[in-house]
């Protein structure tokens, strides 16, 4: 047990509820801690729900859970956050309102961290408006003008969304509204948040609430360090993305069978030039062909999405001029592949294939070289 009163047994029970998508059990356990267990709602959100959701992601990454099971567990976590927040009594604060607009970066669909942040801020007496996932700069600007928040809290989980987050930060700053950034996508200790011009950074919801209470009202003090040359190379990578994706798919077609050229044609003959005589056989063949086609299409989509994320991480690393964005994605990819019995060394083939196509882009070339060194390091150590 720790200072919050949440025991290991309670954590195990909550994990089991998520694993079984047991909405009733999860809500009863979490809300009970608040209403009769003497645990604060904030501690339940940050000491029980948030760590459990991290473990959910780890189980998907390791291949233990399917995407569907991960989504079902996340749904239960979202319901739990709402129920715990509703069960808690929000303090009534005297004085002028403190308005916070909470949003996810453009392209970011990991909404639960921002959801938890919004509820923790409400519990601390802030007035919160939450916009949910993937808010474009124009949409964000429109809401800022309509609601007039004192600060925008921007959540980013995936590093390849950093260039899009930069546009949102710049949009808010042009409107005269400071930005607090949070989430693992902004790097260790918020290094990339500050590089993008954020005014504040918080590692978690408790730190965010504390920072805002300590420095209220927040002020514009951030400054972007993104360089013009990096923006130019990033834009070139974005323009060439379809071409580079096709090149990667060809180079890695033996690793991702679903990326191999597919034919939608079918041959229902019996091999002698005559059509199959059995209607049942024809139906079975059609069903089998449809199933195979669907599986192939799914493999193709998953493989293309995966390669696309690697490309986007390369582009984001170039944008912020920090190879750790790319090597971090390579680390995830290597673990993802290893858990699924795919040879992680195929990532070396990917970096080489990209390097062949991007010789004239110095920042991109340096980032790929850093990625290759990272991939080769375990072999060197052996």
Give the residues covered by each predicted segment.
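Short terminal or interdomain "cap/linker" segment that borders an active site or interface and mediates
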Residues: 365-382
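Cofactor-cradling patches in redox/metallo enzymes
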Residues: 130, 134-192
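Peripheral docking tails and interdomain loops at the edges
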Residues: 184-234
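Amphipathic alpha-helical blocks and their helix-capping loop/short-beta junctions
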Residues: 220-263
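Intrinsically disordered, low-complexity tandem-repeat regions
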Residues: 267-288
């Amino acid at each position: 047990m720790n200072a919050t009163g949440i025991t290991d047994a309670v954590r195990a029970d909550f994990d089991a509820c998520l694993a079984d998508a047991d909405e009733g059990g999860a809500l009863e356990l979490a809300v009970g801690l608040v209403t009769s267990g003497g645990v604060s709602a904030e501690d339940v959100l940050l000491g029980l729900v948030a760590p459990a959701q991290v473990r959910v992601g780890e189980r998907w990454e390791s291949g233990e859970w399917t995407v569907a099971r991960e989504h079902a567990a996340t749904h239960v976590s979202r319901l739990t956050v709402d129920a715990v927040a509703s069960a808690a009594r929000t303090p009534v604060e005297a004085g002028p309102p403190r308005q916070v607009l909470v949003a996810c970066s453009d392209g970011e669909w990991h909404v639960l961290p921002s959801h938890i942040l919004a509820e923790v801020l409400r519990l601390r007496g802030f007035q919160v408006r939450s916009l949910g996932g993937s808010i474009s700069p124009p949409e964000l600007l429109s809401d800022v003008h309509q609601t007039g928040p004192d600060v925008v809290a921007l959540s980013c989980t995936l590093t390849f969304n950093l260039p899009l987050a930069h546009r949102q930060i710049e949009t808010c700053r042009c409107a005269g509204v400071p930005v607090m950034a949070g989430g693992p996508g902004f790097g260790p200790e918020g290094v990339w948040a500050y590089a993008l011009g954020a005014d504040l950074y918080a590692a978690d919801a408790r730190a965010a609430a504390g920072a805002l209470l300590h420095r209220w009202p927040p002020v514009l003090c951030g400054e972007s360090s993104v360089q013009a040359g990096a923006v130019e190379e990033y834009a070139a990578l974005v323009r060439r993305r379809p071409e580079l994706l096709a090149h990667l798919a060809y180079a890695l077609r033996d690793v991702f069978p679903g990326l191999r050229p597919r034919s939608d044609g079918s041959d229902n003959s019996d091999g002698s030039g005559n059509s199959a005589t059995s209607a049942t056989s024809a139906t079975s063949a059609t069903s089998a062909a449809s199933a195979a086609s669907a599986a192939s299409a799914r493999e193709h989509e998953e493989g293309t999405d995966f390669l696309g994320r690697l490309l986007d991480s390369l582009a984001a690393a170039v944008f912020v001029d920090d190879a750790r964005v790319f090597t971090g994605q390579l680390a995830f990819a290597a673990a993802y592949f290893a858990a699924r019995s795919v040879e992680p060394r195929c990532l070396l083939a990917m970096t080489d294939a990209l390097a062949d196509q991007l010789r004239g882009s110095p920042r991109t070339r340096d980032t790929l070289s850093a990625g290759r060194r990272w991939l080769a390091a375990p072999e060197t150590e052996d």
